[in-house]
Amino acid sequence: MQSSMLLRVRALPKTASVLSRTKTATYATYKVPRIDNEPNKHYAAGSPDRKALQEALARTQRNAPLSVPLVIAGKEVKSSSSLTQSNPASHGPVATYSNATAKDVQAAIESALEARKSWASTPFADRASVFLKAADLISTKYRYDVMALTMHGQGKNAWQAEIDSAAELCDFFRFGVKYAEDLYAQQPVHHAPGVWNRVEYRPLEGFVYAISPFNFTAIGGNLAGAPALMGNVVVWKPSPSAIASNWLVHQILLEAGLPKNVIQFVPGEAEEVTKTVLDHPDFAALHFTGSTNVFRNLYGQISTRVAAGKYRSYPRIVGETGGKNFHLIHKSADIRNAAVQTVRGAFEYQGQKCSATSRVYVASSIADSFLEQVASEAKSLKVGPPSDFTNFCGPVIHEASFTKLAKVIDEAKNDPELELLAGGSYDSSKGWYIQPTVYRTTNPDHPLLTRELFGPILVVYAYPDATEADFARIAQKIDATGEYGLTGSVFAQDREALAVANDVLRNAAGNFYINCKSTGAVVGQQPFGGARASGTNDKAGSGNLLSRFVSLRSIKEEFVPTYKVAYPSNEA
């Protein structure tokens, strides 16, 4: 089944008329291709896909470090200073990249603003085609290259790179087109006699600032791509730990036909780039994924400037940040399923997903069996470089993360409320490696049950379960513990228990899972995001997110003229 889309078409010859001088002269109904999720490849031993990916990994390694410039005014710019993105599995260089100065950022902003009028008036059919083409390029020509850069640069194994930099990135671009089509189709449903009412979804007046994280290549593409799809111009600052893959995504968009100055690519020191952006009066929106503390700081900086009347418009602020995501396991749960899902949720990509499982509350009556399986599975996970396909876990992203997590492990050795069940070791001799670590705590208020760690450390508490009231109480404890509200899962076969958890935990997670892990949201299936300290919950992978990057204009046109000033009620 295909769906209709209202598209602006260049149909009139160029004359002196106003209509013919724009790209919005006529309207026609089109149909976009059917949108489906990108099929996953599995990279089994001996498969052609594994061979192709291994070749891309070897080629990327031979060509390292990749030299990444700034892209300003459609031109590649080498700055006077450069920085290095390191491979977290080896400490070797993945890319050297230009470090944007305040002057560079100012030039990027001005270039973006110059492109705004042309891009904003480009028919949606043309804008949509860029992103559909980019998705096809990622799916085919560049699939293994973008995966290889993600694996080398961000420490993901083959499967994690596949579901991120290949599949999810394609899904963001394709479903974005579908959601934009649906948004544009939302028009007034009633028209008085002789009146035509309509709504125009205008791009924001100014530019969008996209700050992307290290942990998902797809998020980088979406943070810059979603506003651009809606006709906005973007200044994109990628994470210093994801430069190589993000650079390739930008190049793919250009190859797909994106005008070169619509998205400005400006890697650099966060403080200097951000200050220059936020000081500009045409700053129109922030699109952010990263830490809660950084987002709060940015929110405050923007608010201060709003209070001072700095901006032309009130900036939109869209952010997805951290989480302290839970698994709640009822005594009726399938224990094996709960254990396997917990190990996957906690240790896939070394626990560096904002949705990663980091705290578990399990019924005491099944705790021993559950913990035995979790500990056994955690101990069996192979840890090492992603280029070895047998490794389930790779390195954590950088030295700062490694140091923080190693300190947690060291401090836990002297904590009487923690029992080490698996892991508890680390190694930085070649790469930043933390063994998958599981603790059992006797304290339901232990700090490790509230503090976001962003690494492969899982803490489990066994709660009393003599009565069903105990289950409701532990659900209330989860809801009241910690400041986040991103993801969470409940495991139970008892439907009444599921109903209790669903009700009590209604605000504890923006993505709530039943009998499955707290990670793995799929574009087009589970829109992603949370509230509380986890962000603005605008739901990546949904039409709601796109609505944040348009400014509506209501238009009323009357076809019947009015010739009398007085109303009937004014008559004598």
Swiss-Prot record:
It catalyses: L-glutamate 5-semialdehyde + NAD(+) + H2O = L-glutamate + NADH + 2 H(+). One of its GO terms (biological process) is proline catabolic process to glutamate. The active site is at E320, C354. It is found in: Mitochondrion matrix. InterPro entries: Ald_DH/histidinol_DH (IPR016161), Ald_DH_C (IPR016163), Ald_DH_CS_CYS (IPR016160), Ald_DH_CS_GLU (IPR029510), Ald_DH_N (IPR016162), Aldehyde_DH_dom (IPR015590), P5CDH/ALDH4A1 (IPR005931), Proline_metab_enzyme (IPR050485). The keyword Mitochondrion applies. GO terms for molecular function: 1-pyrroline-5-carboxylate dehydrogenase activity. The record marks N215 as: Transition state stabilizer. One of its GO terms (cellular component) is mitochondrial matrix. This is Delta-1-pyrroline-5-carboxylate dehydrogenase, mitochondrial. It comes from Emericella nidulans (strain FGSC A4 / ATCC 38163 / CBS 112.46 / NRRL 194 / M139) (Aspergillus nidulans). The lineage of its organism: Eukaryota, Fungi, Dikarya, Ascomycota, Pezizomycotina. The gene is prnC.
